Regions:
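Extracytoplasmic
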Residues: 39-69, 273-281
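Conserved MFS/SLC helix-loop-helix module at the cytosolic interface between two early adjacent transmembrane helices
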Residues: 89-131
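C-terminal membrane-cytosol helix-exit motif in multi-pass small-molecule transporters
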Residues: 186-195, 210-240, 450-457
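C-terminal ends and interior cores of transmembrane alpha-helices
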Residues: 112-127, 358-371, 454
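Glycine-rich segments within core transmembrane alpha-helices of 12-TM secondary carriers
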Residues: 163-191, 410-422
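Cytosolic juxtamembrane N-terminal segment immediately preceding the first transmembrane helix
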Residues: 2-47, 51, 67, 248
Length: 474
């Protein structure tokens, strides 16, 4: 989830609060009562790495199921449907239970749910039916919803307020590492072969998830005994409660309900590109020159098994190679997050959203045009330009809603259901034509997001400023 900061004073940014000398002397992880909570923060960092790793593995599963269960692209998109369905179903219950159980109770509940989903993959591998794997994906996503709902805001209160952004950015950098490692680990297990060259992916699919489940159970035990202070938080979105016009229905604000639609379409585009990345790299990439893989190339190590001869006789990337290349895409996404944070501080957020989305439209059209390696490079660049969209749409959508901001945010979070629906449309187009043509779906999605960004001043009738932190989000 994004960590937006709103300022509602006309044409001016609120002046920085004068720092209390006592607060200035406190360390980044020291509470007002003098307690040092660096160990608590250290534990939270494991949660950030965990859900980054799990999300990274999800995006390399589609191609595995296509080959093992003989599914087409539209059918394999049920993986993304199950994943986002878990987030959708638990978005509101997770917040409610977090209030009832507190930080520690909510985190432990989420960890146990993730462990249950991980252990479920053991019988699912024996059942060997698609629905069994989808159930495990959905359960894990539901548990991750708890962790994301609690861990993101909790990092902001584990010390002096002026270090809140530093703490959450530090935690999110670890999340990025998990996101990078997930596709590599997933590729190693999902696309493994025995000595005879026969795939053993289905037989070994349970191994990474069982390993995650064991680690998660250990984490739950550690959290149970670890000191975790329940710290009162200020308003999550720092919205000025004196903002006028908050008595109207939130649906009467065009900049809000169009943000819900924009978020739905953005997550749809993101999920489609992420989930079909391996398919693109193994089916749409031009023939690879033999000079890239000469006969004397080493047969072992990280690059072992990267190249294979496809049905048309051309040398291309293997599934394992494509899953490793997905990590490069996520690296572009992470770079976009860090650079985007600096850009959003210097330029108006709605303009940045508009131009980034317009760039994504142009890139998708170049992919659609099938321009060889130019199109391949464009796939990676889409990761970069998608990086700031979720938190920016989030911040623009709740701008000026005052006491209604929390209610509005729940609808924007639920809009991630777009990631469950539209990838099936993209898959259907790809099945009918090819995957390059399937990129027309994210093109249209990004087009609406660009429209929302450029039209936001008219929709919101805002005279204030919006500050966005890209420290969280999908």
């Amino acid at each position: 989830m994004a960590t937006p900061t709103m300022a509602t004073k006309p044409r001016a940014t609120a002046p920085a609060a004068r720092m209390d000398p006592h607060t200035a002397r406190r360390g980044m992880f020291v509470l007002e009562d003098g307690r040092n909570v660096v160990f608590t923060f250290f534990l939270l960092v494991f949660l950030f790495a965990l859900w980054g790793f799990c999300n990274g593995m999800i995006d390399v599963m589609d191609k595995h199921f296509q080959e093992e269960l003989h599914l087409n692209l539209a059918q394999s998109a049920w993986v993304q449907f199950a994943h986002y369905l878990g987030y959708f179903l638990m978005a509101i219950p997770a917040g409610w239970l977090a209030i009832k159980l507190g930080y520690k109770g909510g985190i432990i509940a989420g960890l146990l749910m993730v462990a249950a989903g991980g252990f479920w993959f053991i019988p699912a591998s024996h059942i060997a039916q698609f629905w069994a794997f989808l159930l495990g994906v959905c359960i894990i996503a539901a548990g991750l919803t708890f962790l994301e709902t609690i861990a993101n805001p909790y990092t902001t209160v584990l010390g002096p307020p002026q270090y809140a952004a530093t703490r959450i950015n530090l935690a999110q950098s670890i999340n990025g590492i998990g996101l990078l490692l997930g596709p590599i680990a997933g590729g190693a297990f999902f696309y493994s072969k025995n000595a005879a060259g026969i795939s053993t992916g289905s037989e070994r699919l349970w191994i990474p998830y069982a390993f995650i489940a064991v680690i998660v159970v250990i984490l739950a035990i550690v959290f149970f005994f670890a000191p975790m202070p329940d710290i009162e938080m200020e308003d999550d979105y720092h919205v000025d409660e004196s903002t006028p016009d908050t008595r109207r229905s939130i649906w009467s604000h065009p900049h809000f309900w169009m943000a819900v639609l924009a978020q739905f379409l953005y997550v749809a585009a993101q999920a489609g590109i992420f989930s079909f990345f391996i398919n693109y790299m193994t089916s749409q990439v031009p023939p690879i020159p033999t000079s890239w893989h000469p006969p004397h190339a080493p047969a072992s190590g990280f690059f072992a098994g990267w190249f294979e001869t496809h049905r048309n006789g051309a040398l291309g990337f293997s599934n394992k190679a494509a899953s490793n290349l997905a990590s490069l895409g996520f690296l572009c996404f992470l770079i976009g997050r860090f650079t985007g944070s600096a850009i959003l501080k210097k330029f108006t957020p709605y303009k940045v959203l508009g131009w980034y989305s317009a760039a994504a439209v142009a890139l998708c059209l170049l992919i659609f045009a099938k321009l060889g390696w130019v199109s391949v490079a464009c796939v990676f660049l889409t990761y970069f330009f998608m990086s700031i969209m979720f938190p920016t749409i989030f911040a623009l959508g709740i701008f000026g809603l005052g006491q209604s901001a929390k209610k509005a945010s729940s609808f924007i979070v639920m809009a991630i259901m777009g990631g469950a629906v539209l990838p099936k449309v993209m898959g259907a187009v790809a099945d009918r034509y090819d995957l390059s043509r399937g990129f027309i779906v994210p093109t249209l999605c990004f087009g609406f997001v660009a429209f929302y960004g450029f039209m936001w001043p008219r929709l919101s009738k805002a005279e204030g400023t919006v500050t966005v932190s890209t420290s969280g989000g999908h």
